[in-house]
Amino acid sequence: MSVNIAKPIIIQIKDTRDELDFFETVSLPAEDEKTQEIIMNFPTVYIHNWQDSGDFEVYVGESNDIFKRTRQHYDAALDKKRWQSKLLEKDARLFIIGHEHFNKSLTLDIENRLMHYMMSVDRVKHVHNLRDNPQTSYYPMEELDEIFSKIWRGLRKENKELFPTESKIKDSAIYKASPLHKLTKDQEKARNLIIQKVFMAMENGEKQLIFIDGEAGTGKTVLNSSTFYELYCLAEESNKELSCHILKLSKHK
């Protein structure tokens, strides 16, 4: 990978409407023109975070207009049933992340990987958005890994508790079994078929037993976690009641 990839722009502010207004009207105009251009006119990724009983809760998002999107979150904070209400109750912080190579597809993949990582952080007890949206082929997809690592290292400089080392993340059991791993085409095909069968059985009031068979190392654990996670999300979106039980049988010694 080229060593010429620029560092990301990472800005941390207090997560309040007044601080956002100050950043937009005072702090940002004082930055160099390139920084202003990237934050104002490029897609950005953002992380709302706050502490509750010592541990962190986070919301990760991406937007083509960070100021409009953040104000929408503040408007939603008046509803006590929504996660945004925590922004009024807690000493929340907001990270705004920009890069000169960001486009919609790249920011979606960065957002997805940030959620993936945050799920695996010991000090994070709740990630409030967990619907992944992995991208396929786009430019500059080949820069994703390096840009993300630069972002993570930059975030770690701001808060080492919230952002542990990448090696620690990747060694965790939660990360290895995360439902947000990008699936292969065969895994995605199998997942979609299982979900189709499950919802058909639910609609018809039937019972069904589904087996996933495969050798060790073929991705059964990731397929399982991804399938159950997607089932949960779809059921929640359609207001369907769903309880899941996993029976894992192993022939490997």
Tell me the role of every PLM-derived stretch.
Residues 179-208:
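N-terminal pre-P-loop "Q-motif" helix
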Residues 212-214:
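Hydrophobic anchor at the beta1->P-loop junction of P-loop NTPases
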Residues 108, 113-168:
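Interdomain "pre-motor" coupling segment immediately N-terminal to P-loop NTPase/helicase cores
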Residues 1-68, 72, 105:
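GIY-YIG nuclease catalytic motif and its immediate N-terminal context
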Residues 165-185:
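Conserved adenine-nucleotide phosphate-binding loops and their immediately adjacent elements
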Residues 66-113:
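Conserved short loop/helix modules at catalytic or binding sites
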Residues 223, 227:
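Hydrophobic positions on the alpha1 helix immediately C-terminal to the Walker A/P-loop
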Residues 220:
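Conserved lysine of the Walker
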